[in-house]
């Protein structure tokens, strides 16, 4: 087909276009808009979304006195676990107690989770006088406090984080991954780093804060930030009673705006989920009953979301700032802004895999999957089951960056171009012809008997060129009936 290439043409797919496609293509469109307020019909939008949601967490510009504006250098903070009552213990709490070893280990994991995303060097010290951040328990609170911490100020060299020892969340499995106690450690440490609640509410308010009455913008939920008081269900997600152990989407953006990013962590090929090499419990799935809740921060390499051990129907989206439904939860996995995850592996359910602009490798696994590579030269596997490979525009597989479909089974799998954008001149839709004549929407199917590769191409008009569409399908000859054209 090289002879068809010549002139360049511009065309792109429009989400707002008035189109009707197949059931699978429309399901893909639905998931491309998932968790976007105003586009996802499952979300009741009580507050307007904010373009500055992450900045709201640092709206007070709280900073340490020894902090400068050079974010290229790691900022050092020392911390300690108090062993005795300090002289300046807050007036409204009493009956001090120290952290035990398990509690210390959990708090250190929360500290580590902040160091993973920000250019901060945390150093443990046993000298309480030189510590910037202290950890301690209390048994009695005149104000009924569960936990609290202080925000940094230029005149302060030490801040305390305090936790109610009588709360069961700090004495049982709740300080393990996904527990409320573990999230509390992460939340209070966030305060000592300068992060506020998303709006001006607090547990000490006379009237208990609620999302409806206290949130000032849409993203004030535990799907976007560990600094929120409000359930992720308010923004469309559902974590089934678990809590994030590490900073989430807006936390990461906010903390990096203050301290700079950790640009050295996970710079190699990283696997999240099953077969994880992250050495982080919140990024790791051990069996089909594992529950994942995280925002991925990654700085390089060829990286993979491996959710192969789950049996539920999953929706895996590799685009930055997107949310995925993984392992039976809703919107529980997200990707930090500026991060590229290249690959995804689905499980044994009927999954939807959505690629990004990179060269993705997408593997659906068992089940009847929908595979969408997006831009970039992608390698696609449907796996067992009746799989559908969807294309929406020529930019998703141009001749010089062709996709490869590796395990297509004629009579079972489908290639769906029912929503393929042909521009204003392509009202006739995609249709098969024996040879290109220059008409918009003409499609040609060829088979190379030597290489055992099918070539499927669509012309956008005129002589076939580098801006048209061409995908390679490995295996036995496929038929026109294997395609969904409308």
From Swiss-Prot:
GO CC term (a single one): extracellular space
Annotated Zn(2+) binding sites: 187, 191, 197
Enzyme Commission number, as recorded: 3.4.24.40
Highest classification ranks of the organism: Bacteria, Pseudomonadati, Pseudomonadota, Gammaproteobacteria, Enterobacterales
Active site: 188
Organism of provenance: Photorhabdus luminescens (Xenorhabdus luminescens)
Family: Belongs to the peptidase M10B family.
One Pfam family cited in the UniProt record for this chain: Reprolysin_5
Keywords: Calcium, Hydrolase, Metal-binding, Metalloprotease, Protease, Repeat, Secreted, Zinc
NCBIfam families: Zn_serralysin (NF035945)
Protein name from the UniProt record: Serralysin
Molecular function GO labels: calcium ion binding; metalloendopeptidase activity; zinc ion binding
Cofactor note: Binds 1 zinc ion per subunit.
Superkingdom per UniProt: Bacteria
KW Hydrolase (keyword) present: yes
InterPro entries per the UniProt record, alphabetical: Hemolysin-typ_Ca-bd_CS, Hemolysn_Ca-bd, MetalloPept_cat_dom_sf, Pept_M10B, Peptidase_M10B_C, Peptidase_Metallo, Serralysin-like, Serralysin-like_metalloprot_C
Spans of repeat Hemolysin-type calcium-binding: 345-362, 363-380
